[in-house]
Amino acid sequence: MNKIEINAKWMQKTSVVWLGAMLCCLLWGSAFPCIKIGYGLWNIESADTSAQILFAGMRFVLAGILAVIFGSLLEGRFIRPEKGCASKIAWLAMLQTVIQYLFFYIGLANTSGVKASIIEAVNVFVAIIVSGFIFHQENVTAKKMLGCLVGFAGVVLINMNGMNFQMSLSGEGAIFLSTVAYAFSSVFLKRYSAKHNPVMLSGYQFIVGGIILSAAGFAMGGRLSTVSAEGVLMLIYLALVSAVAYSLWGMLLKYNPISRVAVFGFMNPVFGVILSAWLLREGAQALGPVSLVSLVLVCAGIYIVNK
């Protein structure tokens, strides 16, 4: 089996970056409503945290296996964890899979797909703060801070929908905490990809993180008693979302500046809102004036940060 050579200049082409990043955002945006649909197909209640964690673990173990297969086809050989990257895989597994999705799955079960998709967009702002003030990987300018404030205003506004001035810690609060974990994982993935295969890192961290989540969910009493063909297909789709999107995003980050790729992140809430409105029938909230203004503010904030 021959290795598929990835040309750095080809990966840096505007059309390739545009199409690749848009595909990632479309897949990630579809995850918001599809996870909620998956809960219904597997008969997982919104209060059944243990079953939600078990469901997440199963998804990511499968996603990791798919990513390793994908990476092996690209390399023309079976990809194994490279020497000296065990601790790096562990760090990514804890941040990108265990901590991020522990909060994400719990939060999504207690809020709407529309709200979740917009709040998740804040990870762009958090990543800039983390990379600038903690890891000193880039300068945090006044323009970037302005973008952060504009985007945060959008998050605050969406939580005022219907004159509701309160945020649920188990809902919107959990989704926000998941974005913080994702921001840290993005910084580490960019750093580690300089020396290691990003697809290999994504695949094995998914497997490790998925096993941890599965074990935790099972130990907490989580069980998935309702099995159907539709439920299995949805689980496979969600696994493909993670395997394809994270692997492709990691490759784009490897060959391009973070800002050039991150600017496309504004499409995550756009796709999330549209698909949630369509698949979850949240049209009243998704198409309401408050949600639309909130979405515009978040997208404007990301644009200001990256222009």
How should each PLM-predicted stretch be described?
Residues 25, 34-36, 64-68, 127-129, ...:
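Transmembrane alpha-helical segments that form core, pore/gating elements
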Residues 29, 33, 61, 93-98, ...:
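Hydrophobic/small/kink-forming positions within alpha-helical transmembrane segments
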Residues 38, 55, 107, 133-136, ...:
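Hydrophobic/aromatic residues within transmembrane alpha-helices
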Residues 41-96, 126-130, 181-185, 202-220, ...:
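Transmembrane alpha-helices of multi-pass small-molecule transport proteins
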Residues 58, 97, 101, 115-122, ...:
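Helix-helix packing/entry segments at the starts of transmembrane helices
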Residues 67, 129-130, 141-160, 213, ...:
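Hydrophobic transmembrane alpha-helices of multi-pass small-molecule transport proteins
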Residues 72-116, 120, 157, 238-256:
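Specific transmembrane alpha-helical segments of multi-pass solute transporters/efflux pumps
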